[in-house]
């Protein structure tokens, strides 16, 4: 079934030259110009990668601290005790604890955006994996959320860290800011993300790695990027 788009979407799409690929600077400006929502939309960059996600070594996953932040305040939970709990609190974590937080999650509470845990707490956190996993909240070493350095982890999460991972089709979608951001700040964030994705190329990938890349705001049409400008 063909998806029907709104008049606003179609009007925005008409402003895009679909026969060309846009430079990073031009795409950042255009996405801001054609955004039509009545709220401060998120902006996302999507990479279509030539990877085989059935192979473990071609599954990308990690975290990036955007130089200009994401524009989305994060509620951060830290599973830690003792001195590490104190460090997390001082770093600005919203909720810090161990068994008490586990019990809250078991009762259905997942009203937070990022969960961080010290390695010694992961056995306990694993008990609520079914609640955290499907929501993308399970602490993970690749994303820097299973760590003894909770101060840095909380600081990164609060300071604009975003996570990424390939989906089953080899696509990676990463939020890079808001349409209210200056276009140069959006471009800086996108450049940071693209550098990370390009640097994470699996050694077993042959031929072209990035098949295409698009930039879009919430509910808006995608603007194809000139990969060479990244």
From Swiss-Prot:
Keyword tRNA-binding carried by entry: yes
HAMAP family assigned to the protein according to its UniProt record, in alphabetical order: Ribosomal_uL1_B (MF_01318_B)
Alphabetized SUPFAM superfamilies for the sequence: Ribosomal protein L1 (SSF56808)
BP-aspect Gene Ontology terms: regulation of translation; translation
The protein's role, per its UniProt record: Binds directly to 23S rRNA. The L1 stalk is quite mobile in the ribosome, and is involved in E site tRNA release.
Keywords on record: Repressor, Ribonucleoprotein, Ribosomal protein, RNA-binding, rRNA-binding, Translation regulation, tRNA-binding
GO cellular component, one term: large ribosomal subunit
Protein name: Large ribosomal subunit protein uL1
Pfam families for this protein: Ribosomal_L1 (PF00687)
MF (Gene Ontology): rRNA binding; structural constituent of ribosome; tRNA binding
Organism ancestry: Bacteria, Bacillati, Bacillota, Bacilli, Lactobacillales
Subunit structure, interactors included: Part of the 50S ribosomal subunit.
Keyword Ribonucleoprotein assigned: yes
InterPro entries for this protein: Ribosom_uL1_bac-type, Ribosomal_uL1, Ribosomal_uL1-like, Ribosomal_uL1/biogenesis, Ribosomal_uL1_3-a/b-sand, Ribosomal_uL1_CS
